[in-house]
């Protein structure tokens, strides 16, 4: 997890100094990193979005605290904006951008994540068939339209519904 460019540069240098060969990337788990993803992408080989922590920091919540746990919904439009910001920056830099965890395992949400440019999704094996089928069913333009519709929503429920409607109407 990095918060800014200095963190990312320190991490890349530390990895190289100990002889790490191969790709070096950073986790985007704080809003500041997502908003500055273009600068971070210039110094790393990939970006990976940790949506659970990103949501926690974006909404100043704890998923274990009942009254505010609802803000941890991965369909929060502001969270989708942060993921899209990161994916677009990675794409512009020519590097991959991944999303891991339960967020990536939702077939409809996977389409919304891939829409703006997420290039890899990490999830439990049991979720792969449904996510694979959803991604194969919908065109790139449909995924982009679903992402735009979800991000324009005013609530997680509306984001989910508009994404589903957009994908089903392709």
Which residue ranges define each predicted feature?
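Conserved alpha/beta-domain cores
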Residues: 1-170
